[in-house]
Amino acid sequence: MGLTKQYLRYVASAVFGVIGSQKGNIVFVTLRGEKGRYVAVPACEHVFIWDLRKGEKILILQGLKQEVTCLCPSPDGLHLAVGYEDGSIRIFSLLSGEGNVTFNGHKAAITTLKYDQLGGRLASGSKDTDIIVWDVINESGLYRLKGHKDAITQALFLREKNLLVTSGKDTMVKWWDLDTQHCFKTMVGHRTEVWGLVLLSEEKRLITGASDSELRVWDIAYLQEIEDPEEPDPKKIKGSSPGIQDTLEAEDGAFETDEAPEDRILSCRKAGSIMREGRDRVVNLAVDKTGRILACHGTDSVLELFCILSKKEIQKKMDKKMKKARKKAKLHSSKGEEEDPEVNVEMSLQDEIQRVTNIKTSAKIKSFDLIHSPHGELKAVFLLQNNLVELYSLNPSLPTPQPVRTSRITIGGHRSDVRTLSFSSDNIAVLSAAADSIKIWNRSTLQCIRTMTCEYALCSFFVPGDRQVVIGTKTGKLQLYDLASGNLLETIDAHDGALWSMSLSPDQRGFVTGGADKSVKFWDFELVKDENSTQKRLSVKQTRTLQLDEDVLCVSYSPNQKLLAVSLLDCTVKIFYVDTLKFFLSLYGHKLPVICMDISHDGALIATGSADRNVKIWGLDFGDCHKSLFAHDDSVMYLQFVPKSHLFFTAGKDHKIKQWDADKFEHIQTLEGHHQEIWCLAVSPSGDYVVSSSHDKSLRLWERTREPLILEEEREMEREAEYEESVAKEDQPAVPGETQGDSYFTGKKTIETVKAAERIMEAIELYREETAKMKEHKAICKAAGKEVPLPSNPILMAYGSISPSAYVLEIFKGIKSSELEESLLVLPFSYVPDILKLFNEFIQLGSDVELICRCLFFLLRIHFGQITSNQMLVPVIEKLRETTISKVSQVRDVIGFNMAGLDYLKRECEAKSEVMFFADATSHLEEKKRKRKKREKLILTLT
């Protein structure tokens, strides 16, 4: 039996019109060895790389479905970590643009990502209150840190010590010892959410930003350094009073004697506060890579910059203060007052951290990033609330630095939501109009070819001939634009209220408008003499007016131009004859006003979409309701028939576009992609393209393919997608022996881990079958007294006729490192005995010892009770113990030998070139110089 009706599938073709999404952060990235030229910005589910110099998009890092919420470039500049709304993390290569590594561990949106100094570990914080530390090289999770009670806002690795500091919306700042994976210190000095934190002054100072205008500064003292007698106290400044020294000594004494359990690694003391100019909360707080410039901003459009002075600069400042104080003392003594035996000068926080300047952007700041150019110039790039990227530069070394805007990316999108879309008659040009501008896009290249300023646009269409466009505005005006010149030809006051809808007449000689002033007006095109030119230009003139009792929300002509449908605020749709304007039909049944409607190409059907979430299909001959469809989970915002068919599209506030069959009342397909409310859509005259706009600032193009769509298969795919979503939402299986404390298992059950577990189970089943077949084959050969050919398995032949045990090993090697533990966790215990026997075989052969040991130790940990109580497995475990120890020792010896060889080669190279070209050598030298200077200062202070 053939298909009764064939539908063709529409697929997502492109995302355009968005420069940067609001949920994520902007970061500088290094491409082709150039720093400070390229930025990565989140763009819905993708990441766009923009060239700030040319204002061009040069690379798109393709996402899947979820919106991007966080970006973090790796220290080597080769990779970019991207966090998503569903809690997944992908690491993209900036050279190829491919995302090869995926981490799944969080249940909610990623809020912060930070690499450690070498780029080997990545810390991720989420709205699910957990922090997970990932091993980037091994592509797996290391441990989960639990302790915060609300979303994580920031996480930072310390350079010198294996510690992590995190802040959250629970008002806490927590310090984690990564050797033991537990929280050893919680700072409770904040009364509101902590929105950001930075480490300064060689990680001896912490600055936190909360919901007030205060930046709190904390001094960090590490216990080892306090106990080190060679280290002088950095707080003792030349010229400081004995009283201050006594206080510091008393504090030091407190460090040693009255040591609280949480102060065993470090101690935090509040040093003071820096007052911001902004009164609202801190949105972002950051420091540049040199550690000299501190920047923060609130919910407004001002970035505040502070300079962290070096020790030399502070000393210079203190010397000046001292000189001034001595002069003052001399002046007092000359006036006959008693001279102080010693002049006291105290160093305040304002002496160390100085305000530099403020950068005022053109709109509210969503995020920013800082970078120092080789010429000493500071560059600050901003992602603004109105879909805009701006770059400012300034020289912080000048006495009064003036920020200068050097670059701006604007042409690729509107500043506000697009409220109306239209296709040209040849399907090539797309018009989009928002609150302040109209843009004309080339559909094939997605480039903006014309931008024109306008008032708040609500509806639009291309004038026949595609040389002019007409816009209806919120103030009730009609605006006529010429596309060739980009000029506004004419503005006409059409309605007293908002002009909600327009419909071009089928004979293309005029159009009709409906407004909030309860009237429908008819207009004709005409040519009038242009004052500035000898040629005539297009204009419009009003011919008739239809006055109604309610506000008009939508108007639509029937294709034969005999009828006019008018949607009113009283939830009805009234049909009038066009020639006499007499009333013909009233379509009532919607519970809320009809926002959108369209009439089919043959004039037989009218479909209406309402704020009550329903779409109703009516016959235009008698006004009977053929069917009422529950179309969306929120208001239906737009509805349009596909030309020359009874299929139509609807767009809703539930972020979805749906296609329907008005004859069979079937839901054909759902186009998902937008992340927020969809305002409007337009179907091209050919029906091959659909373009839609949303509150997420993006415009999306959907294309009709030649692929037939079968409804039963579509429903099956939807059910599968629902099941996959439900798998991710299931509770994590309990791991025996694991405590739900600070540190916990990092994985998350996903459909990929379930599939990986199924592959392992299938491989074990095949191994069992093949082993049984081989036993049978041996018995047959023995009975026959000759060698009988062994039947070969097609799966093993596909892998190159390998043995069943080698096939199992291949399956284990094929599982992603980040999904390995979770796959083993969902594996039933009945497969574990066979796996353990195979592991013993693999380790004896020396095959992938590291991988097999990782799987073995995890299985032993989660099935400890069942394995130890099973007498059959005792000899297997005993053998595993012997083979594992010997083989792991061999692997360790090989690594040790390789490291010794590399050390030898390093020494050889150094001896030849007589240059210490490894970074640790220079850092050791700098450390020695620093200690020597501190000792000299201490001697000066004591003398």
From Swiss-Prot:
Keywords: Isopeptide bond, Nucleus, Phosphoprotein, Repeat, Ubl conjugation, WD repeat. There is a cross-link at K474, K529 (Glycyl lysine isopeptide (Lys-Gly) (interchain with G-Cter in SUMO2)). The modification Phosphoserine is found at S240, S241, S726. GO terms for molecular function: RNA binding; snoRNA binding. GO terms for biological process: maturation of SSU-rRNA; ribosomal small subunit biogenesis. Residues 326-345 are annotated as: Disordered. WD repeats lie at residues 21-60, 63-102, 105-144, 147-186, 189-228, 277-316, 413-451, 453-493, 494-533, 547-586, 589-630, 631-670, 673-712. Ubiquitous. It comes from the Eukaryota. SMART domains: WD40. SUPFAM superfamilies: Nucleoporin domain, WD40 repeat-like. Its main location: nucleus. InterPro entries: G-protein_beta_WD-40_rep, SSU_processome_Utp12, TBC1_cilium_biogenesis, WD40/YVTN_repeat-like_dom_sf, WD40_repeat_CS, WD40_repeat_dom_sf, WD40_rpt. It holds the Pfam family Beta-prop_WDR3_2nd. It is found in: Nucleus, Nucleolus. Part of the small subunit (SSU) processome, composed of more than 70 proteins and the RNA chaperone small nucleolar RNA (snoRNA) U3. Belongs to the WD repeat WDR3/UTP12 family. This is WD repeat-containing protein 3. It comes from Homo sapiens.
